[in-house]
Swiss-Prot record:
Keywords: Isomerase, Repeat
Alphabetical list of Pfam families matching this protein: SQHop_cyclase_C (PF13243), SQHop_cyclase_N (PF13249)
InterPro entries (UniProt xref): SQ_cyclase_C (IPR032696), SQ_cyclase_N (IPR032697), Squalene_cyclase (IPR018333), Terpenoid_cyclase/PrenylTrfase (IPR008930)
Lineage, uppermost ranks: Eukaryota, Viridiplantae, Streptophyta, Embryophyta, Tracheophyta
Example of a GO biological process term: triterpenoid biosynthetic process
Example GO molecular function: beta-amyrin synthase activity
Organism for this UniProt entry: Rhizophora stylosa
Entry EC no(s): 5.4.99.34
Primary enzyme class: isomerase
Free-text function comment from the UniProt entry: Multifunctional triterpene synthase producing germanicol, beta-amyrin and lupeol in the ratio 63:33:4.
PANTHER family for the chain: BETA-AMYRIN SYNTHASE-RELATED, TERPENE CYCLASE/MUTASE FAMILY MEMBER
The family this protein is said to belong to: Belongs to the terpene cyclase/mutase family.
Protein name: Germanicol synthase
Active site annotation, chain numbering: D485
């Protein structure tokens, strides 16, 4: 039986931590664990997911929840409530529903104070890891039989009805993910016609019907070339000499968005080496299975720019293809031949590996994310198959693995701090401190222990890194990468706790550490007033024309975001109130500029585009919260009035809100089909309206939404899993499994706290 283990490092000599592994969450299979009843419940969860896989595609994240609730002997003791047709919501019923949600959610807290949760959904995360383990000869040790069983389950359960796999679990089929998942099945032992529900046969038919893997986008071409199923001569150049460019050039690596930089760093190393794994009989078979013409007759150069229409979100402009062609024809032939291959290429490869080793060490070999993790790990193995660098990478693979009722998947890198920051704020909003003091104390302890204590090591600016001391990451302290809104939410939590008795919530954070957090936030504001995410923005916008991917947008440079900006306003307004003498003028200017930024990027229909959640509902909740925190009101702020008008206009007949993920790629509001509501979207809209004072004008829309929320609550106090709610890079969705608890709970708390209700 699978079990989730918290804050454990084990005895691996290649594993190390900055805070004794606080926040670490790893899965282990214990063949002797669990009673027959417990195993039956897990199997029932799997079968229920499979039956409903085309209706609800994100997992309910049930396996660890069943484990935690069992270990804590949880039993919902508060009776369920329901609001009947025409019935008025009373304070008693609303508070009862809220207390039920709090009691259930509190039982899901881990021993170190965080709330575990799946953070996955893209279907290109896991296959490269399987391919990497196959190439390096570690497949059997990293993925023994039970792991393989769960990986295959995940692949089967998320195969679309047409036989393909989408970029993410709710997406239409794409060549990229269909090819990767087909290869993954074959590596894990399925035959050409094997797999549940004829998975391999259906997938191969989809691939052939859509032109074969010659139409796979550039990332796919890279991975297939590494595996030996494609040829490097069919890829656009990724010269490692890029890392040798002088810093005054506009396309210097330091000016790139950190994720883009960290993907193409190891990719350029592998490209520069033209590394290809061992050509085994399986690879020979894949060469026959994935193409519609003989492998040795393919014109690779002709396919460099080919991309299946299903994968194409960002068509490359002509100037970009021209640059690739010039590098392909004129530069690469010179750099791969003597003497330049020994003078320039060799030096470029060494410099690239220097950067890779620095980034690996700075993150305790977690690296910035799962795509980058696998590429950096493979680069370390190519450099030295028996070296310590690769062994340290192997030790951190469990940090990325997640298991749920839909199988085993690879996480983005974990959302421990992000989820916990919002969970704490939701719980604090309930005014139930007397009932949940221990929960709050543990959460406070986790947040304090998760703050990053130092900047990256050495001359970090020469390695293109920004300050991180005082920040919070998205996941845990070991990860090490500062994120502006994670920092703002962490700071806000610590400030809220500082206003509470330490005998209830534990020792308050020292002011100097709060000052460090403020320093990080102030450093990330751009001239336009907006806040970037990881590093200061400021590179020229035209560089986005060089976006080398086909299925993402806005990935080349850092940008400013409504969510990051609003989070920072919230935190700094509260900080200014509690520490009025610290950098007062800078903070006041920061807030004023941030407000102007929010007002300037509002869309014509009154919304804000959400960059990290679905979508206009999410962005508008953040924006209205930021404006309200800065002192704006419905009467004084036109932007608020326009936003409220929009939210009221799109409220559904059942009282809720529901937005399709298609809003994100299409950049226009798209409702869910069939007038369907989503409870997370409903919670965001409710809180947005509360920020704008809707209860003082007409509370009816809030009452209607609260009725839906209360009546949707499950018997144990949980809420049902619905559509996916997270997004990144415009076009790829991310499943935040904790959202279905955090936000309905928070919305009910704000409703009970801010909306007048009869006794």
């Amino acid at each position: 039986m699978w079990r989730l283990k918290i804050a454990e490092g084990g005895n691996d000599p290649y594993l190390y931590s900055t805070n004794n592994y606080v926040g670490r969450q790893i899965w282990e299979f214990d063949p002797d664990a669990g009673t027959p009843e417990e195993r039956a419940k897990a199997e029932e969860a799997r079968q229920n997911f499979y039956k409903n896989r085309y209706q609800v595609k994100p997992s309910g994240d049930l396996l660890w929840r069943l484990q935690f609730l069992r270990e804590k002997n949880f039993k919902q003791t508060i009776p369920q409530v329901r609001i009947e047709e025409g019935e008025e919501i009373t304070r008693e019923k609303a508070t009862t529903a809220l207390r039920r949600a709090v009691q259930f959610f509190s039982a899901l807290q881990a021993s170190d104070g965080h709330w575990p949760a799946e953070n996955a959904g893209p279907l290109f995360f896991l296959p490269p890891l399987v391919m990497c383990m196959c190439i390096t000869g570690h497949l059997d040790t990293v993925f023994p039989a039970e792991h393989r069983k769960e990986i295959l389950r995940y692949i089967y359960y998320h195969q679309n009805e047409d036989g393909g796999w989408g970029l993410h679990i709710e997406g239409h089929s794409t060549m990229f993910c269909t090819a990767l998942n087909y290869i993954c099945m074959r590596i894990l032992g399925e035959g050409p016609n094997g797999g549940q529900d004829d998975a391999c046969t259906r997938a191969r038919k989809w691939i052939h019907d859509h032109g074969s893997v010659t139409n796979i986008p550039s990332w796919g071409k890279t991975w297939l070339s590494i595996l030996g199923v494609y040829d490097w001569s069919g890829c656009n150049p990724m010269p490692p000499e890029f890392w040798m460019l002088p810093s005054f050039l506009p396309m210097h690596p330091a000016k790139m968005w950190c994720y883009c930089r960290m993907v193409y760093m190891p990719m350029s190393y592998l490209y520069g080496k033209r590394f290809v794994g061992l050509i085994t009989p399986l690879i020979q078979q894949l060469r026959e299975e994935l193409f519609t013409q003989p492998y040795d007759q393919i014109n690779w150069k002709k396919n460099c720019h080919q991309c299946a229409p299903e994968d194409l979100y960002y068509p490359h402009p002509f100037i970009q293809d021209l640059i690739w062609d010039c590098l392909y024809i004129s530069m690469e032939p010179l750099l791969t031949r003597w003497p330049l291959n020994m003078i320039i290429r060799k030096k470029a490869l060494e410099l690239t590996m220097k950067h890779i080793h620095y980034e690996d060490g700075s993150s305790r070999y977690i690296t910035i994310g799962c795509v980058e993790k696998v590429l950096c790990m493979l680069a370390c193995w190519v450099e030295d198959p028996n070296g310590d660098y690769f062994k340290k990478h192997l030790a951190r693979i469990p940090d990325y693995i997640w298991v749920a009722e839909d199988g085993m998947k690879m996480q983005s890198f974990g959302s421990q701090q992000w989820d916990t920051g919002f969970a704490i704020q939701a719980l604090l909003a309930t005014n139930l401190t007397d009932e949940i003091g221990g929960v709050l104390r543990r959460g406070h302890d986790f947040i304090k222990k998760s703050q990053v204590q130092d900047n990256p090591s050495g001359d970090f600016k020469s390695m293109y890194r920004h300050i991180s001391k005082g920040s919070w990451t998205f996941s845990d302290q070991d990860h090490g990468w500062q994120v502006s809104d994670c920092t703002a939410e962490g700071l806000k939590c610590c400030l809220l706790f500082s206003m509470m008795p330490p005998e209830i919530v534990g020792e308050h954070m020292e002011p100097e550490r709060l000052y460090d957090s403020v320093n990080v936030l102030l450093s990330l504001q751009s001239k336009n007033g907006g806040l970037s995410a990881w590093e200061p923005a400021g590179a020229q916008d035209w560089l986005e024309l060089l976006n080398p991917t086909e299925f993402f947008a806005d990935i080349v440079i850092e940008h400013e975001y409504v969510e990051r900006t609003s989070s920072a306003i919230h935190a700094l307004v509260l900080f200014k109130k509690l520490y009025p003498g610290h950098r007062k003028k800078e903070i006041e200017d920061f807030i004023a500029k941030s407000v102007r930024f929010l007002e300037s990027i509002q869309t014509s229909d009154g919304t804000w585009y959400g960059n990290w959640g679905v979508c206009f509902t999410y962005g508008t909740w953040f924006a209205l919260g930021g404006l309200a925190a800065a002192g704006k009101t419905y009467n004084s702020c036109l932007a608020m009035r326009k936003a409220v008008d929009f939210l009221l206009r799109i409220q559904k007949d059942d009282g809720g809100w529901g937005e399709s993920y298609l809003s994100c790629p299409e950049k226009k509001y798209v409702p869910l089909e069939a007038n369907h509501s989503n409870l997370v979207h409903t919670a965001w809209a409710m809180m947005a309206l509360v920020h704008a004072g809707q209860m003082d004008r007409d509370p009816t829309p809030l009452h209607r939404a609260a009725k839906l929320m209360i009546n949707s609550q499950l018997e144990d106090g949980d809420f049902p899993q619905q559509e996916i709610t997270g997004v990144f890079n415009r076009n790829c969705m991310l499943h935040y499994a904790a959202y279905r608890n955090i936000y309905p709970l928070w919305a009910l708390a704000e409703y009970c706290r801010r909306v007048p209700l009869p006794s």
